[in-house]
Regions:
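Conserved SDR Rossmann-fold cofactor-binding beta-strand/turn motif
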Residues: 2-7, 48, 61-63
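A glycine/serine/threonine-rich, flexible loop-to-helix segment
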Residues: 5-28
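Functionally critical, cavity-lining and gating residues within the transmembrane helices
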Residues: 7, 53, 66
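A conserved structural motif in NAD(P)-dependent oxidoreductases
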Residues: 29-40, 51
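Conserved beta-strand segments that form the floor/walls of ligand-binding pockets within enzyme
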Residues: 30, 61, 67
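Hydrophobic "lid"/C-terminal helical patch
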Residues: 44
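Short, small/polar-rich loop/turn modules that mediate ligand/substrate recognition or access, typified
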Residues: 55-57
């Protein structure tokens, strides 16, 4: 899993809601928002499931399109 910016206490300490730092970051994310911890957990859950049984050796970017 290669996460993008995720809404955490540490993230918000550096980039408060509405700050210039947050606005600048959001210009680099096509979905125009930061990710939620649950979204990373959901990606991990999928990769651990039988549905992902034939997936090997991959990096899954969970970053709102920031790596495009």
């Amino acid at each position: 899993i290669a996460p993008g910016p995720i809404e955490t206490e540490m993230f918000r300490a550096i980039r408060p809601v509405g700050s210039e730092a947050e606005k600048e970051l959001l210009t680099q994310i096509p979905m125009n928002r930061v990710g939620q911890p649950q979204e990373i957990a959901a990606a991990i859950e999928f990769l651990l499931s039988e549905d992902a049984g034939f997936i090997t050796g991959q990096t899954l970017c969970v970053d709102g399109g920031g790596s495009l």
